[in-house]
Amino acid sequence: MTITLKSEADLAKMRVAGRLAADVLDMIAPYVVPGVSTAELDRRCHDYIVNVQQAIPACLNYGSPPFPASTCISVNHVICHGIPSEKTLQNGDIVNIDVTVIKDGWHGDTNRTYLVGDVGVLGRRLVDITYEAMWRGIRTVRPGATLGDIGHAIQSFAEAERFSVVREFCGHGIGRGFHEDPQVVHFGQPGKGLTLEKGMTFTIEPMINAGKAALKILGDGWTVVTRDRSLSAQWEHTLAVTDDGYEIFTLGAAERERFSPTGHQK
């Protein structure tokens, strides 16, 4: 495992990339409505990243087989890596949009789950609990804490709410690379795993299912779905370990009204 501790100059670049990624999710929010296709949402995000932000969408042509879009858009029982298509969103859907922007060689990665129209009680509760689970993990971050502390905070909260945590996919280190060490799993035991140090940068991005945790990957090689077709939600932020806690690079506009980058409520 090779972990690159970031300098202050590096972190300044990551703040820019993270803010751009968050801005994409703010920009697209008004368009997430019944009747819009996920392909149209992807096109809007792509155009904004390339033409307005003068940045690069990291997902496009990433991996093997090459991912065919600039964003991952995952609807209802799709856990992650949903491929945008001409299929339209329906009233009551939940939809996750995952964006990674490259600016001046540095990555900013964030995602959020949106409510489409009038969403039922279970869907709204799942989205809210997943958001809070992400924050439970984030709030454990400080020098001397461990990856197990993060995972335990997420897992214990989600399971107490009678939801399940996806184990096969996780957060990750990030910087000049899209996916760097370490892997940040969303389950674990307190005090176990890698000890956090100032200058580490990574994502926390729990995927929480309303049903069981079991999943399968579809034939396209990318789309991950719940095996029992239960709803799944996800939220993600990119952050750095600081002297005494953390700094989040990907807060959206509404979050910036409520929280400082260090997570303190305003």
Model-assigned labels for residue ranges:
Residues M1-K266:
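Active-site neighborhoods and metal-handling regions in enzymes and metal-associated proteins
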